[in-house]
């Protein structure tokens, strides 16, 4: 029962991550060697010590090798110290003089905090001279045996001492206590010990997710602390007892330091069993700390082994090898070896954390109990710098473990939680052997992530830095599982297949696509794709992520393709579809619309590079269809605030099904995250019936046709009634009661279902408003500008444990900046007389002043206008737009209905490239053709980001003004069946107030 309580307690526990970047803050960068020229040359052994130390550092994966400066006199030392921050003084006393000691004393007198060590080749003469010197200024004395790695060991020993307190407090870093008074011996054993520990730290650094993290992770290696007498060892142990990885002790050493007591030199004899006294004390205090006794007196072996200590014979020719074997076996280095407690036979060998996770349920119970009850797993994790899991398990395993299976679950859950925590906010280097269902975000290649990739990484980091996202029981907040093919993969694909000549030609889009589909992606990525399919087990969105896309200053949102690939258990079929989708996204860089966009934004097409985001599609499967419960686009600026809303409170457009429905301009639900109970579209019954969602998008899971330039070829548009049959509307629908002429909150039998989101917005079924507010606030603060965020939610039918509604998942899919004009507008537009205005809108999008447009293009819409002509009008406008691009001119565009809608009955179905030269776009209502303000979509993101105004007017309802008669009276520069282009001699003045949502176009003076 107790173990189950522990497991339940663990399930609600959040691990605290370790910031390795904060460790090892104090380093030795500059070393002053005090020696006569001959002794310094001997140290360098006919070569440069800098070069040798540099080679030592690089071979062990270390950074920041120190620089060495050699001086012989006090004057030389003073000059170096005047110009350089010296971190360590190495004193090398010569065989014939004591000048080095004199210089060292002078340095220490002026700089008492600089560590000083003695490094000397031992001889009887030097030993006697040292005995007669005042050695109190020196931290350590070392015996030079000709090995350069002793210098490295000295530096690391002092760095460890400088960082010990901080790093233990910051991260729980472990330490190895070495107790030894023999200068010659510790000068020999320290280089071996450090080279082993540093090599092991390189090995455990592979637990990191990318090279940068691996380098930082090495800072979490165990530190080495040297004690030279019993009192010093006891002080160190008692101070750091909770962070001792293990102890290596000599047997015979002094009880106290050889310093003066009561003014006289104290006799400081060595005590033959000082090591036993020390180890017995430690063993009583903590029986789980591994203890190694090393002694030249073999008589101590039997006593040491009887007490449970490991013994290393100092006289052995392979003493250093024996010591390494004991370290690997008992200090947690190397592989973790599960053994049979009776026979000590190897049961299972574990190389890394993922292998422990994969095998924990297969370890025999007696073996698992043997190791957990002795703290072995916790120590192994500590040695690998996996401190959060180690510290938690250490508290569990000190108890009597009765329920071994519960303990397996605790270990498994701890590892899963840790891996999840470490994955969040980190772009890992993709490793097919380690990428699994608990992995998160990885990249293939070394190039750029592109716009969407960067945005996803940024969102992931926001979630990691703000733990309040995880405050809701049973609600997971995350980004979807993602792998990014970096831009260097694109370069390799284009170069190896010689595609640039075709891509940059004027070939039709479909022909460009066919050339790209026939090209080959490198086979080396196939195994990576298979690993990703296995880990996701869901449909995959293949999304463009270009260098220019979602730029802070030039938004390319929606210019390139996004394909969705349904999941199938046939991995080769899946591979074919995903690879074709990747090639199709690459091809979309060179489509006609993309080239037009590049021209409009003054970018060069062959400078664009494409990364590709492979991302699990958020959703749930319902028969042959797959879609999320809720998709949304969230903007931190609301250009259409109503009642007590403000522009700064933002706006969300929510819909049932895939988010492409919102991007395509479908009928979404506009919601203020700060006023979720006030939804304009639900304020009156007739509005709710007319202005809410009737269709939704879903991915068809059956194998469809081959890829085309239309990236929505396998997206089905379904009636909302279909979702009712799927059970998706339970918490997001209201029900129309035709008999009583009322719309009721909630899902009831019979009656038309209205997508109102009432369960999540008004009744607390799911904390969507809170999550929207957090996302908007943290995203805008992180980017330091207004943002647009795409999101999706899956709602479960399972009730949350806290009784607050249902469990669910909230995914952030993309973030990009809303680039607004910084131009000041210090005028009240209401004060401008109507007779000065060509256009006036009380519902405008955009901000700023423009005085360089002379042209107006408008649709010749009469009262009997038919929306059936809209596709034709779009083509006519495209032709005119091309003329403006060629002449590098802008224009004001006026037309009926909603611009850019994929449904031509709602408005003129233009793409951005067809109107890319427009500076103001006006949607004008007609008596028989009512228009409501459009939602924020990719299309309008581009308009507003480039300073283009967007006006909505309905003059027949006295909502805004359009002085069409002025234009009709002017001669046409160009005229088609449905569209006129007129030009003023002087520029029009365009003024937009983005806060008040007002805009005017003034006639020339």
Enumerate the language-model features and the residues they cover:
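Non-catalytic signal-transmission and effector/linker regions of two-component phosphorelay proteins
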Residues: 1-69, 133-140, 144-223, 229-231, ...
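Conserved phosphotransfer microenvironments
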Residues: 13, 42-45, 49, 65, ...
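Short acidic, S/G/P-rich loop/turn micro-motifs used as interaction or catalytic elements
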Residues: 37-42, 74-76, 88-99, 123-125, ...
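As written
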Residues: 100, 130-141, 305-312
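Hydrophobic/aromatic residues positioned on beta-strands within the core alpha/beta folds
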Residues: 119-121, 293-294, 314
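Terminal, compositionally biased segments used for targeting/anchoring and flexible tails
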Residues: 297-423
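Conserved mixed alpha/beta core segments that line enzyme active sites in large multi-domain catalysts
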Residues: 431-471, 520-925, 942-945, 976, ...
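A structural-propensity feature for long, helix-poor, extended segments
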Residues: 479-529, 536, 843-851
């Amino acid at each position: 029962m107790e173990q189950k309580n522990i497991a339940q307690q663990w399930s609600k526990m959040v691990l605290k991550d370790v910031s390795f970047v904060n460790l090892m803050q104090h380093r030795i960068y500059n070393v002053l060697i005090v020696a006569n020229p001959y002794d310094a040359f001997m140290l360098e052994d006919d070569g440069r010590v800098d070069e040798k130390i540099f080679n030592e550092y690089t071979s062990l994966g270390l950074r920041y090798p120190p620089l060495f400066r050699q001086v012989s006199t006090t004057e030389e030392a003073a000059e170096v110290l005047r110009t350089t921050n010296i971190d360590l003084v190495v004193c090398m006393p010569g065989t014939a003089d004591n000048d080095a000691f004199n210089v060292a004393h002078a340095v220490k007198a002026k700089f008492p905090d600089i560590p000083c060590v003695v490094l000397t080749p031992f001889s009887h003469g030097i030993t006697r001279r040292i005995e007669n010197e005042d050695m109190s200024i020196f931290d350590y004395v070392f015996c030079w045996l000709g090995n350069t790695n002793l210098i490295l060991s000295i530096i690391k020993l002092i760095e460890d001492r400088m960082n010990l307190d901080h790093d233990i407090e910051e991260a729980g870093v472990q330490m190895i206590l070495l107790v030894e008074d023999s200068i010659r011996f510790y000068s020999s054993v320290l280089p071996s010990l450090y080279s082993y520990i540093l090599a092991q730290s390189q090995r455990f650094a592979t637990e990191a997710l990318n090279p940068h993290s691996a380098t930082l992770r090495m800072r979490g290696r165990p530190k080495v602390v040297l004690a030279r007498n019993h009192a010093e060892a006891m002080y160190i142990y008692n101070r750091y007892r909770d962070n001792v990885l293990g102890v290596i002790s000599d047997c015979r050493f002094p009880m106290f330091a050889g310093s003066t007591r009561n003014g006289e030199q104290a006799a400081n004899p060595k005590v033959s069993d000082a090591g036993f006294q020390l180890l017995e004390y430690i063993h009583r205090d903590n029986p789980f700390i591994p203890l190694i006794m090393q002694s030249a007196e073999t008589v101590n072996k039997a006593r040491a082994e009887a007490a449970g200590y490991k013994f290393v014979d100092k006289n052995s020719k392979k003493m250093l090898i024996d010591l390494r074997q004991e370290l690997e076996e008992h200090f947690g280095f190397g592989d973790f070896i599960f053994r049979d407690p009776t026979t000590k036979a190897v049961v299972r060998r574990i190389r890394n954390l993922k292998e422990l996770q994969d095998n924990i349920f297969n370890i025999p119970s007696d073996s698992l109990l043997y190791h957990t009850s002795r703290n072995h797993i916790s120590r192994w994790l500590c040695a690998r710098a996996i401190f959060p899991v180690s510290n938690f398990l250490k508290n569990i395993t000190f108890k009597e473990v009765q329920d071994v299976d519960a303990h397996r679950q605790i270990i498994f859950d701890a590892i899963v939680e840790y891996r999840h925590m470490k994955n969040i906010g980190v772009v890992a280097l993709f490793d097919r052997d380690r990428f699994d269902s608990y992995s998160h975000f990885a990249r293939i290649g070394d190039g750029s992530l592109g716009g969407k990739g960067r945005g996803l990484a940024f969102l992931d980091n926001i979630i990691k830095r703000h733990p309040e996202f995880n405050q809701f029981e049973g609600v997971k907040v995350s980004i979807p599982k993602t792998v990014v093919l970096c831009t260097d993969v694109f370069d390799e694909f284009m170069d190896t297949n010689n595609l640039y000549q075709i891509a940059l030609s004027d070939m039709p889009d479909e022909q460009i696509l066919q050339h790209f589909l026939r090209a080959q992606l490198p086979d080396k990525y196939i195994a990576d794709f298979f690993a990703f399919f296995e880990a996701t087990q869901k449909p995959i969105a293949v999304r463009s992520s270009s260098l220019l896309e979602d730029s802070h200053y030039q938004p390319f949102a929606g210019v390139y393709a996004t394909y969705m690939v349904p999941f199938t258990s046939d991995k080769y079929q899946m591979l074919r579809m995903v690879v074709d989708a990747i090639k199709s996204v690459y091809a979309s860089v060179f489509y006609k619309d993309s080239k037009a966009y590049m021209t409009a934004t003054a970018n060069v097409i062959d400078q664009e590079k494409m990364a590709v985001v492979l991302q699990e599609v958020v959703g749930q499967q319902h028969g042959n269809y797959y879609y999320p419960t809720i998709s949304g686009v969230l903007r931190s600026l609301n250009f259409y605030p109503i009642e007590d809303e403000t522009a700064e409170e933002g706006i969300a457009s929510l819909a049932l099904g895939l988010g492409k429905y919102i991007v395509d301009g479908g009928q979404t639900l506009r919601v203020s995250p700060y006023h979720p109970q006030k939804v304009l579209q639900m304020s009156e019954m007739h509005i709710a019936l007319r202005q809410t969602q009737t269709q939704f998008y879903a991915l068809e899971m059956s194998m469809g046709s081959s890829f085309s330039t239309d990236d929505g070829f396998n997206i089905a548009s379904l009636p909302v009634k279909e979702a009712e049959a799927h059970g998706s509307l339970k918490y997001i629908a209201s029900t129309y009661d035709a008999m009583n002429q009322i719309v009721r909150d909630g899902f009831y039998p019979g009656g038309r279902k209205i997508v109102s989101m009432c369960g999540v917005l008004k009744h607390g079924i799911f904390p969507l408003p809170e999550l929207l507010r957090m996302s908007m606030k943290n995203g805008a603060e992180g980017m330091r500008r207004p943002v647009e965020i795409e999101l999706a939610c899956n709602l479960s039918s399972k009730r949350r444990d806290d009784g607050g509604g249902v469990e669910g998942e909230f995914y952030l899919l993309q973030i990009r900046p809303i680039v607004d004009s910084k131009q000041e507008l210090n005028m009240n537009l209401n004060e401008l007389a109507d007779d000065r205005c060509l256009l006036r809108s009380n519902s405008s999008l955009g901000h700023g002043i423009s005085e360089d447009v002379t042209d107006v293009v408008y649709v010749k819409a009469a009262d009997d206008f038919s929306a059936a002509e809209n596709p034709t009008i779009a083509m006519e406008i495209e032709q005119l737009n091309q003329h403006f691009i060629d002449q590098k001119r802008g224009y004001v565009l006026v037309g009926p209905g909603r611009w850019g809608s994929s449904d031509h009955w709602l408005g003129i179905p233009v793409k951005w490239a067809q109107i890319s030269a427009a500076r103001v776009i006006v949607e004008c209502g007609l008596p028989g053709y009512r228009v409501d303000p459009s939602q924020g979509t990719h299309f309008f993101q581009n308009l507003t980001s480039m300073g283009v105004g967007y006006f909505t007017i309905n003059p027949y309802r006295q909502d805004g003004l359009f002085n069409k008669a002025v234009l009709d009276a002017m001669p046409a520069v160009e005229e088609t069946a449905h569209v006129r282009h007129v030009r003023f001699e002087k520029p029009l003045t365009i003024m937009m107030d983005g806060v008040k949502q007002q805009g005017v176009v003034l006639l020339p003076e």
